[in-house]
Swiss-Prot record:
InterPro entries: Tmem135, TMEM135_N. This is Transmembrane protein 135 homolog. The gene is tmem-135. Its main location: membrane. It is a multi-pass membrane protein. Induction: Up-regulated following cold exposure and upon fasting. It comes from the Eukaryota. Involved in fat storage. One of its GO terms (biological process) is positive regulation of mitochondrial membrane potential. Belongs to the TMEM135 family. GO terms for cellular component: cytoplasm; cytoplasmic vesicle membrane; lipid droplet.
């Protein structure tokens, strides 16, 4: 231990000689006992999570036809994905204790970073190959957000209001650039046409299905204004922008209303009048406004620039997409923004691979998943406030709330901001401790 601790100090790594019991698994002094305490809860949680996930996926893909679902495959998928999640949790806890035992102390990186990377690398090999790229992309998304929050917690960067618009805008511009030069995969062309109404040559709204007053207004918009030679839409630029707004906002309002009702079923049952209040609330209108203004700003900008000479079409489309990203101010969502950014980067990468400019790494998704998940889980231990609240709640449920029982007062030694999410002081038997709790525990709670 002496030689290893000197090596750690020479590498700039402070050490903590506390045991894994008083540091991590304060609910049980025995490492194996602590592991078996967490296992049943994690297994049940994993089965519930993936049973719900695969059921929804199958119902949607089969359009509600339960008789068309392959229930045997459903059961296998649920068990395999649940085993993957439990494996990740188990190896994470086991390796935390093992590294403490092997070294005789903790350092910042052995407090969860190394063990979580190894655990995640082992676990992802259990999961289906078809799901690995999606999991890797999601965790890259989450890890990049966590890293930014981590830097913000220590004052290196600043959290900006509506900052979600920036990564969302970059992602949209990359997608639009690929679409403009004809290299966007077909599966994404549909998404772009739905989100931005970028390549629409037919009527967006069927005038036969709307009331007379609205039909007259729509016909006026279509006939009283003009469009440029560069525009592909069938009617005027004003009409196309307004129609794209109306159509997407209608879909957004429907989706938002359904989700609002599902989330507030109990409240509505207790008092049905609450339904009206919920549907006209500001929260319920955020998604529709975002969905509506996204194509409106894009098409209004693109049609305006089509009237300006010497503006290349590709530059026009890319700039319009970037400007349209300000629509996210109505519905600021980090998960959507980061997913759009990283999915666009992934699409550009594979385009460059296909054209021979970049190499394709075998099992690259396994490596990416291991590193990014390891970083996120490490932050769950040492600095939980850097993690997105939804994912932190997911981890909390996976381990049955035991993540809140870590003795984070000892982590102050490493300079982390650890105690502002889980403030409860853990109870443990001091006879198993190497550091006297009186040195850091408050005398009065």
């Amino acid at each position: 231990m002496g030689a290893l601790s000197k090596l750690a100090h020479s590498l700039g790594q402070p050490i903590l000689t506390a045991t894994c019991y008083e540091t991590i698994h304060t609910w049980n002094p025995d490492c194996n006992g602590a592991f078996f305490d967490a296992l049943p809860v994690g297994l049940i949680f994993s089965l519930k999570t993936y049973a719900s996930f695969y059921l929804i996926t199958n119902v949607v893909s089969k359009r509600g036809r339960l008789d068309k679902i392959n229930w045997k495959k459903f059961g296998i998928d649920v068990c395999q994905s649940s085993l993957f999640l439990v494996t990740n949790m188990c190896f994470f806890l086991i390796l935390l204790c093992k590294f403490r035992k092997w070294l005789g102390f903790f350092t910042p990186i052995t407090m969860g970073l190394v063990s979580s990377i190894l655990a995640s690398g082992i676990a992802i090999l259990v999961e289906k190959k078809s799901r690995r790229p999606a999991l890797a992309l999601y965790l890259i998304n989450l890890a990049s957000e966590t890293y930014y929050r981590h830097l913000a917690n220590h004052g290196y960067v600043t959290m900006h209001t509506y900052g979600e618009c920036i990564p969302f805008g970059i992602g949209l511009m990359l997608f639009t650039w690929l679409q403009s030069i004809g290299r966007l995969p077909k599966s994404f062309n549909g998404f772009m046409n739905v989100a931005l109404k970028s390549n629409v040559s037919e009527n967006l709204i069927n005038e036969k299905k709307i009331p007379d007053n609205f039909r007259l207004f729509l016909e006026k918009l279509r006939s009283d204004y003009k469009k440029t030679e560069l525009c592909n839409h069938p009617h005027s630029c004003v009409s196309h922008s307004v129609e794209s707004f109306a159509k997407n906002m209608t879909f957004g309002l429907t989706a938002s209303s359904v989700l609002t009702v599902i989330r507030n079923v109990r409240t509505i049952i207790k008092n049905p009048l609450n339904l009206i209040t919920l549907l006209v609330s500001k929260e319920n209108l955020k998604l529709p406004l975002f969905a509506g203004f996204l194509p409106f700003i894009f098409n209004a900008t693109r049609c305006s620039l089509n009237r300006v000479k010497y503006v290349p079409p590709v530059l026009n489309n890319v700039f319009s997409a970037g400007l349209a990203s300000v629509a996210m101010a109505f519905y600021p969502t980090v998960s959507i923004a980061m997913y759009c950014l990283w999915k666009a980067i992934e699409t550009v990468y594979f385009d460059l691979v296909d054209r021979g400019y970049l190499p394709k790494f075998k099992n690259g998704e396994v490596i990416l998943y291991a590193i990014t998940t390891g970083y996120v889980l490490w932050n769950a231990v040492v600095e939980p406030r850097a993690i997105r609240r939804g994912y932190l709640n997911f981890l909390f449920g996976l381990v049955g709330g035991k993540i809140s029982l870590f003795n984070r007062r000892l982590y102050d030694h490493f300079g982390f901001v650890s105690r502002d999410v889980y403030t409860k002081i853990p109870e443990f038997d001091p006879k198993y401790a190497m550091i006297n709790p009186m040195l850091y525990m408050p005398l009065v709670e």
